[in-house]
Amino acid sequence: MRTLWIMAVLLVGVEGHLLQFRKMIKKMTGKEPIVSYAFYGCYCGKGGRGKPKDATDRCCFVHDCCYEKVTGCDPKWDYYTYSSENGDIVCGGDNPCTKEVCECDKAAAICFRDNLKTYKKRYMTFPDIFCTDPTEKC
């Protein structure tokens, strides 16, 4: 299921905030997000279940939880504004909902950056059929 969602995004030509999130991740980590994070662990990419495999996967778990709290807009598709000032991401705009989405994405990108040293290539294309531990609650 995660694979189909990612492929659909790639084929459609990413619109709205998914492209913005990709740019944030690239800026913070230097990694290509689709290759490095789209299929990482049990939570990066579409959906998630089980227990996060490591700190990077936990970044995705927390990001999913952050999205669950957003109301009034579609976190995956609605466009938001942000800028980069002195290496920091600054979320802007007048819409509180899309600003909240931006803050979720910003926190995840920073989390990825802060956990680069523990990033494990073995989780880069981790099959979700191995995510069998009980699912944690947000």
Curated annotation (Swiss-Prot):
Report, as the record phrases it, the tissue specificity of this protein: Expressed by the venom gland.
> Which top EC class is named for this enzyme in its record?
hydrolase
For this chain's record, the cofactor binding note is: Binds 1 Ca(2+) ion.
Where are the membrane-spanning stretches? none
Positions annotated as active site in the UniProt record: 63, 105
Compartments, as annotated in UniProt: Secreted
Pfam families recorded: Phospholip_A2_1
The cofactors it requires, by name, are: Ca(2+)
Q: Where does Ca(2+) bind?
A: 43, 45, 47, 64
Q: Name one GO molecular function term.
A: calcium-dependent phospholipase A2 activity
* GO BP annotations, alphabetical order: arachidonate secretion; lipid catabolic process; negative regulation of T cell proliferation; phospholipid metabolic process
What's its EC? 3.1.1.4
**Keyword Protein biosynthesis assigned:** no
**This protein's GO CC annotations:** extracellular region
Q: List the disulfide bonds.
A: 42-131, 44-60, 59-111, 65-138, 66-104, 73-97, 91-102
| CDD domains associated with the record | PLA2c (cd00125)
Role of this protein: PLA2 catalyzes the calcium-dependent hydrolysis of the 2-acyl groups in 3-sn-phosphoglycerides.
- Give the protein's recorded name: Basic phospholipase A2 PL-X'
Species source reads Protobothrops flavoviridis
